[in-house]
Design a protein with these regions (language model features):
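Strand-loop microenvironment adjacent to phosphate/nucleotide-handling motifs in alpha/beta enzyme folds
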Residues: 1-125
Length: 125
């Protein structure tokens, strides 16, 4: 069952999750804490992902309060972001440099789309 065929979510593999944890630990050891770490996740359409699992998909309609798209980093957080490769740190202090910060919110509308090969790896390993 799927609530909305237009629903998009930010997602990454468990391997990417493990790598993010390791990078976070390494970065914290070298630079100290005081930040929230995130990752430039890719967007996946839930209908496309469901098709990898089954051909029998029933659309049941949105639930109250359910969003079609997902926000990871909001407009008010942009000025406090620091980009390190595929990682995004959100700190308390403002980032004065525009060279290594986000310029727009990071969400399932702005994120790169997951390819069919990536979805296959996500589902089937």
């Amino acid at each position: 069952k799927l609530t909305d065929p237009d629903m998009n979510r930010l997602i990454f593999t468990k391997e990417d999750s493990a790598k993010l944890i390791n990078r976070t630990v390494d970065f914290t050891r070298k630079n100290g804490g005081g930040f929230v770490q995130s990752y430039k996740m890719k967007c996946v359409n839930m209908l496309d992902l469901a098709k990898f699992i089954s051909d029998d998909i029933e659309i049941v309609g949105k639930r109250p309060g359910e969003k079609t798209d997902e926000d990871l980093i909001s407009e008010r957080e942009i000025s406090r972001t620091y980009i390190h490769g595929d990682d995004i740190h959100i700190r308390m202090e403002e980032n004065k440099s525009e060279d290594n910060r986000l310029t727009e919110p990071y969400n399932s509308k702005s994120a790169p789309k997951m390819t069919s090969d990536e979805m296959g790896k996500l589902v089937w390993g």
